């Protein structure tokens, strides 16, 4: 690997960074424990498919069902409901994390292109961020995003995207689930793709083999590679 891995506390949150010199791209990704296990494979995959120097920042999320969702919703698994912490997470990225990264690596907004990506609920967070004013991102990756989330598609239909590039993906067996709300995910992701294209967003939709609980890292890596190749 050409990247150096390091751990840091940035703006009060623990982050895992993969760094190389002369970076032209910042890749930001909220992660859980499983995502962190796949980081090495993910970074290696991106390295193998682009020569563009980049820095990847994995933001450790401790309350997965709260910090990534924009409004409350009933629980799907177990008894923990979804919260509305996405606003605070975006504020942290925009006002603290990016400022510390620019200072640490002697960068300015004009030096690098910033992409946001994530898997599952982090993919939903990326989609939601794509619709927020003053978004600091040039493109987003929503890999197997939770587009089934209560109220999401109505929100996407009634708001204007603020990014110019978006990558979506889904496993071809993800709709085969006993969880009713998630069984519509194939239809939901295609509706999301159509909504973005109606707004003239450069949108890529990719189908992967398998269900939801596999290949998180590679699936997310594919999205970042597409952005690097199409949005710089």
Model-derived regions, located:
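Serine-hydrolase catalytic machinery in alpha/beta-hydrolase-like enzymes
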Residues: 21-107
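The feature captures the conserved acid-bearing segment of alpha/beta-hydrolase catalytic domains
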Residues: 148-219, 225-227
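A conserved short beta-strand
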Residues: 135-147, 165
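Short, hydrophobic alpha-helix immediately C-terminal to the catalytic nucleophile
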Residues: 127-131, 221
